[in-house]
Curated annotation (Swiss-Prot):
This is Heat-inducible transcription repressor HrcA. Negative regulator of class I heat shock genes (grpE-dnaK-dnaJ and groELS operons). Prevents heat-shock induction of these operons. InterPro entries: GAF-like_dom_sf (IPR029016), HrcA (IPR002571), HrcA_C (IPR021153), WH-like_DNA-bd_sf (IPR036388), WH_DNA-bd_sf (IPR036390), WHTH_transcript_rep_HrcA_IDD (IPR023120). Keywords: Repressor, Stress response, Transcription, Transcription regulation.
Length: 344
């Protein structure tokens, strides 16, 4: 059966109405609201054809139609009108990123808050791969607690790690400063993934005259080697799914919330999408268990042309796709610009 212009108009009207109301759509509703220039009977016949083509579904015998995953896909690829944020919204995004944020964790956490706020969907983000990062700086600092010190490690991707550790009796601030110098001299510029295999003998030898520091060095190195080597996952607005009528079923809600709570599950979303550009996965196009009734939209962000990670959102298949896409594009651009400033 051929998809002609009238069928396209009917399909677009059904999808737009269903996205707006969440209720199955009948032919009379389309005739009344969308001024297609044909009778309800003609629209009804077109809707029956669209159902036969797999683009619409009829959830109940006497109800109207709703879009299928295939129908949404056709709409997104062929029929969806372009959408843009208003100048006021674009300025709002810029202002949010103009806040003083010194660490990449702050920037990505703010990014997920912003996406969730502007779309009312669950927002997710994948940070830079720390396995490919290197150690930029390490400091061991005294703190106002007996026998404690603060280890601060900064990576080349802007991630800052903090660790509090116990130090031996008699270790002075001058000793901690010496340890910092030795660690920086030996470890600065090393890839994090290489730290586990590095030879420690040089460091132990250099600090050998300070016997009470040897054990501290060992503990410090253990802390450094425990730095996360994978991409960190950020999320916000996961409870937004409770506001969607599709997710009123408690078992389905539990399944989705459980999925959103698992870092590794969210990483799989990003790892199964192309590394660059915008990707839209609708319903069963998501081959990951737990989200086959959802749509996922992701987009990459970059620093000086190098892809660093991805941001995205998860919501019902009855998603305002054009709005979601325009928000993600604007946010990804602002995020990339912010990170370029941060890395300088």
């Amino acid at each position: 059966m051929r998809m002609d212009e009238r069928k396209q108009k009917v399909l677009a009207a059904v999808i737009q109405d269903y996205i707006l109301t969440g209720e199955p759509v009948g032919s009379r509703t389309i005739a009344r609201r969308y001024n297609l220039g044909v009778s309800p009977a003609t629209i009804r016949n077109e809707m029956a054809d669209l159902e036969e083509m797999g683009l619409l579904e009829q959830p109940h015998t006497s109800a109207g139609r709703i879009p299928s995953d295939q129908g949404y896909r056709y709409y997104v690829d062929c029929l969806m009108p372009p959408a843009h944020l208003t100048p006021e919204e674009e300025e709002y995004v810029r202002r949010r990123y103009n806040q003083k944020m010194l660490e990449i964790e702050q920037v990505l956490a703010e990014t997920t808050r912003l996406i969730s706020e502007m779309t009312s969907y669950a927002a997710i983000a994948l940070g830079p791969d720390q396995g490919r990062a290197s150690l930029e700086e390490v400091q061991v600092l005294p703190i106002q607690v007996a026998n404690k010190a603060l280890l601060v490690a900064v990576t080349s991707t802007g991630v800052v790690e903090h660790r509090v550790l116990t130090i031996p009796e008699g270790v002075t601030p001058e000793d901690l400063n010496r340890i910092s110098r030795v660690l920086n001299a030996r470890l600065q510029g090393r890839a994090l993934e290489d730290l586990r295999q590095m030879v420690l003998s040089d460091i132990y030898q250099e600090l050998a005259q300070h016997r009470n520091l040897v054990n501290l060095v060992r503990d410090l190195l253990q802390q450094l080697l425990s730095l996360e080597s994978g991409e960190r996952v950020y999320r916000n607005g996961t409870l937004n799914i409770l506001n969607q009528p599709e997710f009123k079923d408690l078992d389905r809600v539990r399944e989705i919330l459980s999925f959103l709570d698992q870092d590794e599950a969210l990483r799989r979303i990003f790892m199964t999408t192309p590394s660059t550009g915008l990707t839209i996965r609708i319903g069963q196009e998501n081959k990951i268990e737990g989200i086959d009734k959802c749509s996922v939209v992701t987009i990459s962000y970059a620093v000086e042309g190098k892809i660093m990670g991805k941001v995205g959102l998860l919501g019902p298949t009855r998603m305002q796709y054009s709005r979601a896409i325009s928000v993600l594009r604007c946010v990804a651009d602002a995020l990339s610009q912010t990170l370029e400033q941060l890395y300088r």
